[in-house]
Amino acid sequence: MELIREARPHGREKLRANLIEWFHWLLREAELYDVRYPVKGAYVWRPYGMRLRRHVEELIRRSHDETGHQEVLFPVFIPYEFFGKESQHIRGFEKEVFWVSKGGEEGERLVLRPTSETAIMPMVKLWVHDYKDLPLRLYQIVSVFRAETKMTHPMIRLREISMFKEAHTVHVDREDAERQVREAVEIYKKIFDEMCLAYMINKRPDWDKFAGAEYTIAFDTVLPDGRTLQIGTVHYLGTNFTRVFEVTYLAADGTRRLAHTTSYGISERSIAAMLITHGDDAGTVLPPRLAPIQVVIVPIFYGEEEAASVISYAREVEKALREAGMRVHIDDRPDKTPGWKFYFWELKGVPLRVEVGKRDLEKRQVVITRRDTLEKYAVGLGELVDAVRGLMRTVEENLRRRAWEELRSRIVRAETVEAAKAAIREGKVVEVPWSGDNDCGIKLKDLVGADALGVPLDSDASVGGFDLRDLACGEKRAEFWLRLSERY
């Protein structure tokens, strides 16, 4: 394999200047998603986008199946009788709920699920009898509905979240449930690593935790414009839901005890984060393991006399790659120029492009271009499969490395309100000294003019031996670093 062109990746100026406008352009031009459906916050997955989504769903399913989770499917309707039982939960979600206001002649009051804790617990009560039935780990990938009143954005802020993976687990005690929380964090790390996403892990402040949770752990990523996006959450629910639904089990000592539960979710926001994180002004770059098409072959010929032999050679190349288990497509459209095809497939994020022309046929070689760097390589047909496998690994490693470098460069610390404000204006995630007091935390985020992500769990959250004061409540000694950012 011979390098014949050095790296010259596309710029990111347009993406950084107006990320949402760029994202709309990408979804439209790359034929991933259509935003023109006439209901606010509800969008259409196009065939190419659906193929990408299916690969992500397969990753999510595999990651859960391998760790003892079982897939289920619950109805979209939740009786209000169930939904209204957990007081914190209904207070947190009531403003976002879609109500079924009429259904034939029946007057039953129903909710379109915003999340499924109140749907699943009544059934778990019927299934769990004694400690031998636990732990129980369930998950489903479904649509959930939120009556968003804020501005909606494709994949990012929706009224119908159509790829909501929610896991719900039931345990004998807090210790086992919190062990499950830690496992859920590891599952999510594996998923996001395969998506080549960099992430922060933050314990949400109490005022921003999931409604009905004891605590919430969130995965946040930083997008190229400096705003953060929540891409996954893990909740320890304690006995808040099992108490109101009377989910108990017979313990080994013969006593009946309340079960402890967790829940954790991922949605199509993770796909949005992947498309944007790996995007540039020419389109996006898809991680090879998730790309609908891993290799696109572009035959280059001039005139009818070259076409037959070059296309025949392209099909030979395709056969070799397909037999090696790769997802391959030949673009032999006669009405499009090679340059147009290069632009089109770069836009759609195909990781590798293989060019074959008359000279390549004569030399029994191909030219391979990496989408992430635009480096070109001449590769002999005999080493083609190994070269493509190696380049796909290299592309994946490079996407992951770039994402982590970008994220780490965004996180800074500030010990004054003015310094924190300046960092936010520069598109940074800023860590500021905080006492842990909720009122002080709310005041602090308002002083800085940012959102609170919470206390970092991926680094030392303690201020250590430094005598730092809470930036909002100077009379209180700081105990933690509190992460702040602008976020979607």
From Swiss-Prot:
Keyword Ribonucleoprotein in annotation: no
InterPro entries: aa-tRNA-synt_IIb (IPR002314), aa-tRNA-synth_II (IPR006195), aa-tRNA-synth_II/BPL/LPL (IPR045864), Anticodon-bd (IPR004154), Anticodon-bd_dom_sf (IPR036621), Pro-tRNA-ligase_IIa (IPR002316), Pro-tRNA-ligase_IIa_arc-type (IPR004499), Pro-tRNA_ligase_II_C (IPR016061)
Gene Ontology molecular function, alphabetical: ATP binding; proline-tRNA ligase activity
Keyword Acyltransferase: no
GO CC annotations on file: aminoacyl-tRNA synthetase multienzyme complex; cytoplasm
Entry's free-text remark on domains: Consists of three domains: the N-terminal catalytic domain, the anticodon-binding domain and the C-terminal extension.
Function: Catalyzes the attachment of proline to tRNA(Pro) in a two-step reaction: proline is first activated by ATP to form Pro-AMP and then transferred to the acceptor end of tRNA(Pro).
Subunit structure: Homodimer.
Protein name in the entry: Proline--tRNA ligase
Species assigned in the record: Pyrobaculum arsenaticum (strain DSM 13514 / JCM 11321 / PZ6)
